[in-house]
Every structure is written in C-alpha cells, then in structure tokens.
C-alpha cells in the first residue's frame, strides 16, 4: 500500500494509488452537483475528494457548512499555498463559514521553528488570505485553549499503534510530534465545536490525506450514536450515550421502540432522524460531529524538484520576494534540458523533469 508522509518535501505520492488504496474519489463525479464549477476543479487542479457530495449539496441548497484549512508557518508563504487559499475563499463565497488555522504547534514540534518565527510567518499567511478576500475566523493553535481541550478529548479516541500505522511513527518519534497530529485533528473538528455541527470541507494537498483519515475516524468515535437504515425501519444505536439521551430519542419519534442500547424508528427518513438525533446528542453534552469532507489538489512543483516547500526556500517563489530575487531563482531552476547540445538536438528536452514547464 502507498505510504504518505505529510511532512516530506518530495511529491512521491502515486495519485492513482490514492484512489485505489485509500478510497479517494475523483472530483468529476461531483461536478454536476455544483451550480458554478470553479476553474480549479474544471481544470483538474483539484483532482479528488472524500464525501464532497454533502458540501456540494449544501452549496446547491444554500444550507450551512464550514470550510477549514491550516498552514504550517515554517517559512514565508509562497505560490504553492495560493491554490488552497483560493479554495477556502471560494467556499466562503459559496456560503461557507470560513476557518483558517496557523499550525504553529506543528511547525515548532516538527520543524523546530521558534515561536517568534511562527508568529512572524503566521501573520504573513493571514495577510495573504486577507488580500485574496478571505472573510472568516483565524487562530494560532498555541493560543486557542478551546482547541487544546478538543485535542485532549480527541486523543482519548486514538492510540499510538494507530498513529504508527497511519504515519509510520516509531520508538524515536517525539511526543510533541504525535501531539501536533492530534491538534490537527482538533483543527478539522473545531468549526463544529465553535459554530455548531455542520458538514465541513478541508481543502488540502494530496499528501495531507493521513490527517483527514484520522480525523474522520475520530469524529465517528466521538459520536454518542450510530444511525443505521434497516429494512422497514431506522435503528439509532448507542455507542456511549447516557440513558437519558436514549430515552430522549425514543420520545422524539411517535412510532419508536426502545430496546437495550438502541431505539428502532418506523417512519421518517434517515436524514430527518439523523438531524433530530444530533440535536439530542448536543443537548446531552455530545459533539454530534458530521464526518468531515475533503478536497485534494495537485502539488505545485518546486524550482529545485520535489514540491514547492517553505522548508526549502530555494524551491519557492515567495510573495515577499523582489523581482530580481525571483528572476535569479527561476533562471537557476531545474529544467528538462539534456547534458549536451548534441543530446538536446537529437533527443529533445524532458518536459516532465522541468520545474518551469510544469
């Protein structure tokens, strides 16, 4: 099975295997549901998704939804970040409530960036977002106490074996690195804690799918109930719900029957039952999370090969750089030219290796 490292600077992700091994769906199957398809989807810059149908439905029906993404402030923002910034802004323009996290805890734990530099780089990211028209809530992980509380709750639903299976963590992995992963799970779920349960989309690069898979699993584990559509009825089954919540579910539906650990309901649709059960779960202290959705965009190639990464400054074109600096970087970028003029004439260039062409 393809291994994905969210912290690597090399684009070694086989996109086709993402679809076959991890169940990511191609973006084409939801485009007919979107009233006005944005250029980044139409041109296949965004190539895949998980459960984006529920977001497309919210856009089409003008129902509430959230959009969240995060940026690790390990360096200056650059062109490689522009795609996800535009995605977030577009989703806000379609009616979503916008959230952006500055992942300073991750930058400090994984890259060793000082808190002072995290603050400096983080403010640059937020300035770029504002320049693109972002309207919504922003925060630094280290300063959000509600986020930290949520991360602690999420951590009760995952063990180190699971983190090892997803991320390849070993005996030498720092605890702060593992904690930064759980903080990112909390980032993904935070909009539903802050503004109430609603479908949530997280636009990310394809290398960030491990975080999405972990967050989706934890969101499910943190629910009080599961809802199953059976033949002729809907079964609401307790996972860890208090008896009072189970009684409330029974009382909410006229033709419901309560059994040990579950309530079976005749009549009504699964959507209607799920909405009412969420209200009951929230009223009894639960989270009632929707499983988060995601979109995946392709990498912008770095000037030195690999992906454009803040941790490799010479690979990037940063927004703050002067024209002479950008020109020098571009002129020194890896191209698809051959070793000699004779080879170039005989064989031609290799555009797939050329960072400027790509």
PLM-predicted stretches and their roles:
Residues 1-66, 73-191:
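N-terminal Rossmann-like or analogous alpha/beta NTP/dinucleotide-binding catalytic cores
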Residues 1-72, 220, 228-315, 319-323, ...:
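Non-catalytic terminal extensions that flank enzyme cores
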Residues 74, 197-201, 314:
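Short, solvent-exposed beta-strand edge segments and adjacent coil->beta transition regions
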Residues 81, 85, 208-212, 354:
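Short alpha-helical patches at coil-to-helix transitions and adjacent helical residues
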Residues 88, 305, 357:
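Residue-level signal for inorganic ion chemistry
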Residues 116-288:
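Divalent-metal (Mg2+/Mn2+/Ca2+)-assisted nucleotide/phosphate chemistry catalytic cores
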Residues 116-118, 141, 202-205, 295, ...:
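Conserved phosphate-binding loops in nucleotide/dinucleotide-binding enzymes
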């Amino acid at each position: 099975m393809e291994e994905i490292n969210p912290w690597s600077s090399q684009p070694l992700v086989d996109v086709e295997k993402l679809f076959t091994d991890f169940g990511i769906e191609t973006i084409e199957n939801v485009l007919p549901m979107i009233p006005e398809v944005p250029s980044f989807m139409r041109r296949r810059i965004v190539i895949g998704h998980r459960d984006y149908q529920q977001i497309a439905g919210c856009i089409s029906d003008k129902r509430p939804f959230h959009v969240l993404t995060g940026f690790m402030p390990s360096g200056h923002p650059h062109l490689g970040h522009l795609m996800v910034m535009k995605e977030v802004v577009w989703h806000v323009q379609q009616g979503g409530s916008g959230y952006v996290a500055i992942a300073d805890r991750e930058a400090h734990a994984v890259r060793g960036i000082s808190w002072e530099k995290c603050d400096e780089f983080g403010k640059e990211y937020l300035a770029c977002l504002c320049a693109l028209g972002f309207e919504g809530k922003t925060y630094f992980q280290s300063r959000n106490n509600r986020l930290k509380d949520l991360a602690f709750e999420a951590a009760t639903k995952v063990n180190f074996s699971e983190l090892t299976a997803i991320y390849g963590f070993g005996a030498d992995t720092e605890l702060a690195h593992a904690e930064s992963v759980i903080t990112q799970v909390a980032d993904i779920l935070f909009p539903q804690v802050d503004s109430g349960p609603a479908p949530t989309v997280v636009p990310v690069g394809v290398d960030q799918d491990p975080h999405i898979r972990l967050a989706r699993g934890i969101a499910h584990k943190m629910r009080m109930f599961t809802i199953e559509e059976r033949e002729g009825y809907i079964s609401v089954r307790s996972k860890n719900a208090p008896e009072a919540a189970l009684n409330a579910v029974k009382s909410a539906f006229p033709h419901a029957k309560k059994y040990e650990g579950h309530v079976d309901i005749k009549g009504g649709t699964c959507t209607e039952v799920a909405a009412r059960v969420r209200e009951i779960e929230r009223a009894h202290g639960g989270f009632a999370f929707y499983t988060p959705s995601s979109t995946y965009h392709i990498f912008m190639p770095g000037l030195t090969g690999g992906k454009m990464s803040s941790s490799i400054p010479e690979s990037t074109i940063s927004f703050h750089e002067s024209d002479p600096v950008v020109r020098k970087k571009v002129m020194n970028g890896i191209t698809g030219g051959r070793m000699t003029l004779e080879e170039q004439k005989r064989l031609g260039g290799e555009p797939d290796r050329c960072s400027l062409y790509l």
